[in-house]
Amino acid sequence: MASKASAVWNGSLKEGKGTISTATGVLHNANYSFATRFEGASSGTTPEEMIAAAHASCFSMALSAQLGAAGLTADRIEKIETEAAVTLAKTESGFAVTRIVLNTKAKLKGATKEEFEKAANEAKNGCPISKLFANNTEIVLNATLE
């Protein structure tokens, strides 16, 4: 299965601007620019924000799968909420995503802290987005069972 998105950029790096769209239409001509990426402007998105969204959603689904494999049926998984923070930093070889912090909270019926932490670590290592960054980015997991 291939997921598709497209980007259009017009102009120079600092003065230009672009739009991002997904094949599903969930994003349609979403704005992005140098200012949104490097100067904190709030009038658009950034590639790193989209990575954060992808990683948070991928991890949450992977955690649900790991909990299911551990015997926690769907009726016992009330909620998994994950926030991802992606750090873009200047390195010797240019800008790079250097760190991703996953903060996840889960409401589960009848799960022990040990079961939850094991499933969360397996999800962190098994999530396809985590695998994409595993060899070149620090991935930190903060997992809380409520």
Question: What do the PLM-derived regions correspond to, one by one?
Answer:
Residues 1-53, 57-146:
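Extended beta-strand/beta-hairpin segments
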